[in-house]
Amino acid sequence: MAGMDQVAFDGGSVGFRVSPDEFLRAPQFAAARDEVIEGKLSLYEGSHLFNRLILEEGRLLCHLAALSLHAAQDMAKPATWLTLGRLQREVTELGVASRNRVEAQVSCLRRYGFLTQQPHASDRRVRLLVPNEALLARDAGVLGVLLNGLALFGLSPPAGQPGAPDATLHRALRRATLPRLPALSRLIRRHLPLAPFFAHDCGYMILLLLLRGARQNGDGGIATGYQWLAMQTGVSRTHVRRLLEAARSAGLLTMETRGGHDIRLAPAMWQAADRWFADQLAFMDLLLREALTT
C-alpha cells in the first residue's frame, strides 16, 4: 500500500487558510487530536445502527451531500431542491457511489426515520428529502467536536461557545461544505494507509477506539480483543478480525496472540492518524471561515 507521502495530492487546490502541516507543528496539536477522538467517541459509542449507516467512506459522503444540499437549497429555485435525483447526481460526480447505491442508502435512512420524503407544497409531483432532527443534531454534534478542537488553537466562532453550533452557524457550515465536497472526497482518498479502516463498516469507530486505547495505556499494548471491539461497534467478531488483519498487513499495528488481546499500534499508524486529524482540522477551519463571511 502506498505511503502517505507517495499519494499525489495538491493541498493548495483545497484552498486551506491554515495548512494541515501548520496544525501538525502546533504545540496544541496532540491535545486537539485527543479532544477530537474523545468527542467523536462520545457521539458514536452505543449508536450501532447509525454508525453502520454512516461510518464508511461512500456512505459518509452521501450523508454529507444530503445535509449540504438541504442547507443550501432555495425553495424559490427548483434546481437547488434536495431530491433523490439531485443527491444521486451530486454523489455520482464524486465517484464514490453509484446511483443505485445512493438510492439504497436513502432507503435505509428513510426506513429508520433519519430521512423523510415529502411532496413539495406547490408541486406535489416533486418529492423532497428532509433530514430529521436526530440526523441534524448528530451532524451538529460532529461539527461541534471539530470546532472544540479548533478552539485549542484560538480558532473558534466569535461567540466562543463550546459544543455544537447553533442552527444558523450549522446551516452556514453545511452550505460552505457543498462546493467543497469534491475536495473533501480527494482529501479522504489521499489517506491510503488508513484505507483498511475507512473502507469497512464501522472501521472509523474501531480506529478511534484503538487510538484512545493506546493513549490510555501510554502507547502500550491494547488488551481489548476482537470480541470487545465487536460489542462496542455492533459488527461481528469476524469482521473486526479481518479489518485488524488488513491493518496489520498494512504495517499499522502488530498482534501476536489469538483473539487480538495484544494489539500494538505502529509508528506508521500514529503518523497516518495525525495527518488525518490535521487534514480534518484544516478543512474545518476553512469551512468555519467561509461560513462566517457569507
Q: What label would you give each PLM region?
A:
Residues 1-76, 80-98, 111, 121, ...:
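Intrinsic disorder/low-complexity detector
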Residues 96-111, 234-248:
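Short amphipathic alpha-helical interaction segments
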Residues 110-120, 248-258:
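A short, conserved structural fragment
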Residues 122-131, 259-267:
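Minor-groove-contacting beta-hairpin "wing" of winged helix-turn-helix DNA-binding domains
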Residues 217-252, 256:
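Glycine/small-residue-rich hydrophobic helix-like segments
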Residues 247-253, 257, 263-270, 274-276:
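Compact recognition or signaling/catalytic modules
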